[in-house]
Amino acid sequence: MSLDFLPFSRPSIGEDEIAAVEQVLRSGWITTGPKNQELEQRFAERLGCRHAVALSSATGALHVTLLALGIGPGDEVITPSLTWVSTANVITLLGATPVFVDVDRDTLMCSAQAVEAAIGPRTRAIVPVHYAGSTLDLEGLRTVAGRHGIALVEDAAHAVGSEYRGRPVGSRGTAIFSFHAIKNLTCAEGAMFVSDDSALAERVRRLKFHGLGVDAYDRLSHGRKPQAEVIEPGFKYNLADLNAALALVQLKRLDALNARRQALAERYLERLAGLPLAPLGLPAHKQRHAWHLFILRIDAEACGLGRDAFMEALKARGIGSGIHFIASHLHHYYRQRQPRLSLPNSEWNSARLCSIPLFPDMRDDDIERVARAIEEILEKRR
C-alpha cells in the first residue's frame, strides 16, 4: 500500500485561521490596518518588549534595520556563514561587507569569542542567529557588542517561542522574527521587528512604508491630514491585515503548537538513539527550545551513504527533507569574492545537514514511519 507523501514541514491551519482571514476580507480593509496594530500589541505583550513592528518578511526587516542603524558602504557586519543567505545579501546590497564567522560544530551557532576575534575598525553590527529553535549565548554576545560599541541584531527567525535563561527571545535588545510558511508561527509571509530602542523602532516603522510619517490606516483612524509627508526615502515592506489576522490566531496557538513540536522531537530523539546520525548538540545555558527544525548530520563514513543519497532514499519512501543550510560563503557569488575563506565547522555541516519532517500536525505514527525508513536505509548500507 502506498502512503501519502510526508513533507518535512506543513503549516498548521485550522478553522479559526480561515475565519479570521474571512473576517478581514469582509471588512473592506485588507491591507495594513487594525489587525497589524493588534498583532504588534499582542506580540510586544507576550515578549515584554517595548516596541514591535510588523513587516512583510524577515529579509525586509533586516534590510531596514541595518539601514536604520546607518550601515552602508565601507562598513562590515559580522554574521555566521551557516544561515540563510538573505543575511549576506542584505548586507551586500547596502554596500557593506559581510564578515563570516564559523559556528560551533554541534550547536551550529556562533560564539562570543568567534565574533570578537572578527571585530575590526570597520565593524558596525553583529547579526548572530538562533538556530533551529535553540538559543545563542546572548550574555556573551551582549558583552562583546557593548564593549566595542557595536549594534547587536538577533536573527530570531527560528526562535519564536524560544526562551533564553527564562526570558523570551526578543524581550531585550533588538531581534527579528520570521512568520514564513514553515515557521512555528506563520502568516504565509511576514515578520516582526522588536526592540527596546525607541529611536530605532521609529525609523524602522518609517522605512518599512515609503519613509512616510504615518500610514493610510493611521491617517484614517486618527483624523490626520489625507496626504502624508515623506520623511526620508523608504521601502514597501508593510504587512497586509490578511496576513496579520492569520498571525494573531497563530500567536494564540503558539504555546500548544510548540509543545507538540517538542513532544515530536523528544520521540525522534528516543526512536533514533543509537543510530549514527549526529543530531545537534544543545548549548550549556538554560533555555526553552522551540524545535523549529529537527536536524541530522549524515556522514558518509558513519552512515554508509552521503547526505544527498540519504535524502533521495527518503524521497523514494515518500518522505520529504530539507537542507538548512548551505553556508553562505560557499555560494558562487561569495565564493568568488572570498575564495580563500575557510570555516571548517560550517563547511563540514553544510555537506551533512538534513532536516527531517517536524510540524505540529504530524501524527505519532508519522514519527515511527520516518524512523523505520531511516533504519531501513542505514541497514542496507551496512
From Swiss-Prot:
EC class: transferase
This protein's record includes keyword Lipid metabolism: yes
One Gene Ontology term of the molecular function aspect: UDP-4-amino-4-deoxy-L-arabinose aminotransferase
Cysteines paired by S-S bonds: none
PTM sites of type N6-(pyridoxal phosphate)lysine: K183
Pathway: Nucleotide-sugar biosynthesis; UDP-4-deoxy-4-formamido-beta-L-arabinose biosynthesis; UDP-4-deoxy-4-formamido-beta-L-arabinose from UDP-alpha-D-glucuronate: step 2/3; Bacterial outer membrane biogenesis; lipopolysaccharide biosynthesis
Family, similarity comment: Belongs to the DegT/DnrJ/EryC1 family. ArnB subfamily.
Designated name of the protein: UDP-4-amino-4-deoxy-L-arabinose--oxoglutarate aminotransferase
Gene designation per UniProt: arnB
